[in-house]
Design a protein with these regions (language model features):
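Conserved alpha-helical substructure of the radical SAM core
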Residues: 2-154, 165, 170-176, 180
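C-terminal accessory region of radical SAM enzymes
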Residues: 2-13, 181, 187-196, 218-247, ...
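Secreted/processed peptides and extracellular or luminal domains of membrane proteins
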Residues: 67, 71-74, 224, 255, ...
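Short aromatic-enriched loop/helix-cap "lid" or pocket-rim segments at secondary-structure transitions
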Residues: 67, 115, 143-144, 169, ...
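Short catalytic/ligand-binding loop motif for oxyanion handling, primarily in non-cytosolic enzymes
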Residues: 75-77, 110-112, 140, 163-167, ...
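Conserved C-terminal portion of the radical SAM core fold
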Residues: 96-104, 124-131, 148-159, 176-241, ...
């Protein structure tokens, strides 16, 4: 049985039986972490450490999705994070006892040329929750086995279409290939609880008519089926005529995002690139989490005195 949950910009359907079993299997520490993540007063007192670290392994993507700027990365700008930087990050994560690691923040993570070595290092992260998000195109058998062996708790595959024609139109990829990869992953996982499987569709004019077909296709296979609202960042240089703001953005209060080049950001949206906090090559996560830059940003959010970049983000505008 699938339950519907309205999460604002995300409309979610989830397998009640599977998610209940998964949550129970993850234990009481995990449940306490999730309660803290969803706490309505999370902005009142700054946590001593981020709840989650998001990590980008590459600067680029092998797909050409029409709604994503990663489709247009020049060859000279295609960069992959060094394995040693990942190792340094894992050391930081373990020292701070961060609860959650999310890999694949802004680009396609599984095309990293040393993805096997990266997963071996990430396996050493002592976290309660470990998520990988991918387009699924590079989810071959070897990588799928590595993901399962690394202790990943959640695998999230961005699909955006129910038919191969729409999939190619939106993503310029091969849906049959990706679905075969997912089916093999499910078979390799077998009766194990983890990783759970989430599939998602970013709703836009091109695919909205396939919502029901997408839902029916993935019921019985995916544990979570999400429909997301497309966030438009094209107007970032033009201040919106907005007079009311609500401090709904809790990103800098609960997570940090790390780019392929080691630069650390206070949020996982494209707007976050305007607020670099430092670099994991020479600064610890603890220093950046407690630093002046992020403290100033948090205060702006709490007092609704938003800077011109955040002022255009849907998380804080009405």
């Amino acid at each position: 049985m699938y339950i519907f949950e309205d999460r604002g910009s995300v409309k979610r359907y989830y397998s009640q039986e599977r998610i209940a079993a998964i949550t129970e299997a993850q234990g009481s520490d995990y449940r306490r972490y999730r309660e803290l993540w969803d706490a309505p007063n999370i902005m009142d007192d700054v946590l001593e450490k981020p709840l989650e670290i998001m990590l980008e392994l590459t600067s680029w993507c092998n797909y050409k999705c029409k709604m994503c700027d990663k489709a247009f990365v020049p060859e000279k700008d295609k960069v992959n994070i060094p394995v040693e930087s990942v190792r340094r990050l894992v050391t930081n994560i373990n020292e701070m006892k961060v609860a959650s690691l999310w890999v694949g923040a802004f680009s396609e993570c599984l095309i990293h040329p040393q993805i096997g070595d990266v997963l071996d290092v990430l396996k050493e992260a002592d976290v309660l929750d470990f998520t990988i998000i991918t387009n699924g195109s590079a989810l071959n058998e070897k990588t799928a086995k590595k993901i399962i062996d690394a202790g990943v708790k959640r695998l999230s595959v961005s699909l955006d279409a129910a038919t191969k024609e729409t999939y190619y139109d939106v993503r310029k990829g091969d849906l049959d290939q990706v679905e075969n990869h997912i089916d093999r992953f499910i078979a390799l996982r077998g009766e194990d609880m983890f990783p759970s499987l989430r599939v998602s569709m970013v709703m836009m004019e091109d695919n909205v008519n396939e919502r029901e077909a997408f839902l029916e296709k993935w019921k019985g296979k995916a544990d979570i089926i999400d429909f997301q609202v497309l966030m438009d960042a094209s107007h970032i240089e033009h201040l919106a005529d907005v007079t009311e703001y609500t401090p709904e953005c809790v990103e800098p209060f609960r997570r940090l995002a790390i780019r392929y080049d080691g630069v650390v950001l206070p949020c996982c949206t494209s707007y976050g690139t305007y607020f670099p906090l430092g670099n994991i090559r020479d600064t610890s996560l603890k220093e950046m989490w407690e630093g002046e830059k992020i403290r100033k940003l948090r205060e702006e959010i709490k007092t609704k005195n938003f800077n011109k970049v955040c002022r255009n983000c849907k998380k804080v505008t009405q």
